[in-house]
Amino acid sequence: MEIRKIAGIAPDDRAAVDEAFAGIEPLPVACCNWPAEFPYAPEVSFRMFHTGDWLMLRFDVAERYTAALVTEDNGEVWTDSCVEFFIAPDDSGYYYNFECSCIGRLLLGFRKE
């Protein structure tokens, strides 16, 4: 996947970030990893770009019910309603893992496959 570069946008310039995202077609996340255990899958799409210095990622989620019980960062946010983003910057087998709950609690990691 190629990530579009849009230079000159600061992450704290909400209007510019929103305008950039508005010009990007959302891509669906049409994957249910454990359909036998969890047959319900929310509607999820994402948009992404980078500025050269920053990676900007926006998820849009429509979910029937939400859970937000984990209140600390680096807690078990995967047990709540959350989105996950994994990125490998090279072929070393290492990757970054970002998970964010619907209330903004984060789980961050750097792992090897």
Regions found by a protein language model. Give the residues of each.
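Structural preference for beta-rich elements and adjacent junctions enriched in aromatics
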Residues: M1-E113
